[in-house]
From Swiss-Prot:
Keyword Repressor: no
Disulfide partners: none
Superkingdom of source: Eukaryota
Organism encoding this protein: Drosophila grimshawi (Hawaiian fruit fly)
UniProt protein name: MAU2 chromatid cohesion factor homolog
Location relative to the cell: Nucleus, Nucleoplasm
TPR repeat coordinates: 96-129, 451-484, 491-524
Physiological role: Required for association of the cohesin complex with chromatin during interphase. Plays a role in sister chromatid cohesion and normal progression through prometaphase.
Pfam families to which the protein is assigned, alphabetical: Cohesin_load
Biological processes, Gene Ontology terms: cell division; chromosome segregation; maintenance of mitotic sister chromatid cohesion
Keyword terms, alphabetized: Cell cycle, Cell division, Chromosome partition, Mitosis, Nucleus, Repeat, TPR repeat
Amino acid sequence: MSVANTTAASQDACYISLLGLAEYFRTSQPPNIKKCIQCLQALFTFQPPSKVEARTHLQMGQVLMAYTCNIDLARRHLEQAWSISEPLMNFDDVKFDTASLLAQLHLKTEQSPHAKAMLRRAVELSQNNVYWHCKLLLQLSQIHANDREYSLASDLLAVGAESAEEAGATYLKVLFLLSRAMILMIERKTNDVLALLNSAGQIIDNNIPNPHQKEYLKVFFLVLQVCYYLALGQVKTVKPSLKQLQMSIQTIMAPNWPSDESIFGGNQLEMFVWLPKEQLYVLVYLVTVSHSMMAGYMDKAQKYTEKALTQIEKLKLQEDKSILSVFKVILLEHIVMCRMVMGNRELAIREIAAARDVCLAVPHRSLLKRHSAQLHCLIGLYSMSTSFFEHAERQFLVCVNETGERDLKLFANLNLAIIYLRTKRDADLKQILDAVSTENTHTYSSQALMGGFYYVQGLHAFHKNSFHEAKRFLRETLKMANAEDLNRLTSCSLVLLSHVFLSIGNSKESMNMVTPAMQLASKIPDIHVQLWGSAILKDLHRMSKDVQHEKEAYANHVKYSENLIADQRKCVQSAHHELVNWFQGDPPLTSGASLTHLPVAAAAPEASTSSLQASTAQFGQFY
């Protein structure tokens, strides 16, 4: 053996020994990261070949990122690994792993443009390696989506679908198609979403031979289909898809179902999973909560929220993934609205504070940035329901200014319109109704929200004593609400229509409207409609000289009033009530002493329709 060969063999032995030692220290209990890094650093003293040097720099970067806060040193090692590996042939794993990790590091330091540039270069170089090409396309599209650059994200996913098709990777192609449908859904490109879902659905049914992969894709497909219908406010239309989704998730969660690793570990082009099954399980609960709330089943929504939150806490104990915080915030946002409908506003403000805490706990305020507008909207609803109208107005205006989501903006504007109506600001009311009408004439918004728009116009007409016009708008609302089983919108419309008929002296029609309104309101349950309806019933029974029923209606009205007043006192004494004063920056922490000031508006409402204000209306979803 020559001296050169002996030296090379000796060096190889050193590399292997040092790598083995480094791995030993890394996997020790507890890990000894300092010694692990020292072993990897020692490799460089042997002036190793380029590929060994690049791999070692990558390993250093991985260890520093995973176990230390030394981001700068991690970046230097990864940049060194990239500069060495970029021109090397047949070295894809190190080259593209480095690019992927560098992009993650840039995101950690809030340098999204650097992350995109890095990945664009890697995508360009990876065209002959389908696995890495698709993986990097997914990563890059995710960053564009997070930055709300949806068209760019969509284009990249279309490229991924083509690449997967050329490679004969049908499972991967469907993943790209469904991911693109999700982006198009955010962009509200309704027709494009339908076309993609139909295309993906046919492939899932006919071209995915592996039954386990097929079921996973089916869950992804059904989640999107359910979200699509819910975004359009089609609560009745969505029921068959939701039922199918619930059955599919039960199949996947069954004890005899194989692990994700065994389903997706066989072929490199099938090692892509949208979400692991445990997270899918939470997501199905979430869309079920959304459906229950929109349909007006508050008890169901509460039950499923509690189950989902319990599941999230279990998963957090195993591994605290960032998506679990996203799920938790969205669930809390839903349940807050349910609490307010039921008159539990003190519980609602506590849960708004809990959502705030989840947002503040996520690094770089990334979750707060995404949900700040929703939090302002919820605080606006809370302020409105506790009669802090000035605070409510400011909260809704902040929400409108912060959000780019059309439905959320419409939702906030409709509630602003009700504030202007109740505070007799006719010019502001006209301006906002005209703006809402113009913005939504040529777009297909949620049926629930558009029904809400007609309801507000009916309420406006009622306050102007334009009873014929009020009936016209409310019948349109009822038509939309009944078509899709939007029970809360139906009950609100019926009780207002009853009040319209009462105002024009048609007690028979008024009774015909208020009776089903109260039945629905007790099922939901909606304390505001019950309060309003009981006042109407009291007047109707007084007019018909039915003393016994008049007494019952009055007793019910007093009961609902007292419940709301007691809850109001709790609200304004809660430390979390201070959130009504948050209008910019980070929301304040509210664990201090309770507040003691009571607003004038907390006085008991009179049990008479002549003095009764229209109840705060919240129209369906805004996610």
